[in-house]
Regions:
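Substrate-binding cleft of extracellular glycoside hydrolase catalytic domains
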Residues: 1-120, 124-127
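Acidic/polar low-complexity segments and flexible, solvent-exposed patches
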Residues: 2, 205-274
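Hydrophobic anchor at the start of a short beta-strand
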Residues: 60, 129-131, 153, 235-237, ...
Length: 274
């Protein structure tokens, strides 16, 4: 488990060396927010936070706060984010932050879910590790969790433990944390996956189009080779009823969408939905 924070324009005075010395391993930095049409407004502190955190040796990822009202807008927002972050080396995910705005609470689960998928798919297609941020309640109340199983999640729940029934990789456990080097409150997070290693294993130049060797009946060394190659892309692999299951989560239930997800990335061969 790794200790982290997430920061934005709300944290204007940060001594990143002190933050590092305080035991913070990673920071998720707000790249900005998108308007209803997907246009990006960059956070006033984004560049400063990115420079300070990386100079201090802290792993970094980014998140976008969303006001997107359509899949077209969400895709545009993702494209704008990619333009901004391509100059940086990210070792944590690129996150889509969807919260209790009236456009979502007054909208439909169908539209909200499609907006999330549109952004996350666009980010993944650009070769980045995509993640959905929302609260535990928002996920069940305003989205269709069963349609979001292929995406890792950063769950907000301010409690002594996270009781989200859906798999997640990061838990935001308080909005009033205190860390040496930061004036005032800051969000605190725990990461339960080794994101730097996973992301390092993702070859962005090959992720979008990858041909895997296979046999008509995969077994033995062929199967092991396939498992190894898929694992290097940040997926878990496991056997169920004699079949190779693949996903970003290590359970059968959470692997159901992965065949379509892999095919969209260009994998071909013995990839099927079981």
């Amino acid at each position: 488990m790794k200790n982290g924070i997430d920061v934005s324009y709300c944290q204007t005075k940060v001594d990143w060396n002190k933050v590092k010395a305080a035991g913070i391993d990673f920071a998720l930095i707000r790249v900005g927010y998108c308007y209803n049409n997907g246009a990006l407004k960059i956070d006033n502190m984004f560049k400063s936070h990115m420079a300070g955190a990386t100079a201090a040796g802290i792993d970094v990822g980014v998140y976008l706060y969303s006001y997107a009202t359509s899949t077209t807008a969400a895709k545009k927002a993702a494209q704008e984010v990619v333009k901004v972050i391509k100059q940086y080396t990210l070792t944590y995910p690129v996150c889509f932050d969807i919260e209790y705005e009236s456009i979502y609470t007054g909208g439909s689960k169908r539209v909200n879910t499609d907006i999330c998928k549109a952004f996350l798919d666009e980010i993944e297609d650009a070769g980045y590790y995509a993640m959905l941020y929302c609260s535990k309640d928002f996920l069940d109340s305003y989205l269709y969790p069963a349609e979001l199983t292929a995406y890792d999640k950063w769950i907000a729940q301010y409690a002594s433990k996270c009781t989200c029934p859906h798999p997640y990789g990061i838990w935001q456990y308080t909005g009033t944390g205190r860390v040496s080097g930061i004036a005032g409150n800051v969000d605190r997070d725990y990461a339960y996956k080794d994101y730097p290693t996973i992301i390092k294993g993702m070859d962005k130049t090959q992720l979008q189009k990858q041909q895997l060797p296979y046999s008509v009946i995969i077994s033995g060394s062929d199967l092991n080779s396939l498992k190894d190659q898929i694992s290097k892309k940040g997926y878990f692999t496991f056997m169920s009823d004699g079949k190779l299951c693949v996903g970003k989560f290590a359970t059968v239930a959470e692997a159901n969408k992965t065949a379509a997800d892999l095919k969209r990335k260009g994998f071909t061969g013995a990839v099927g939905k079981w």
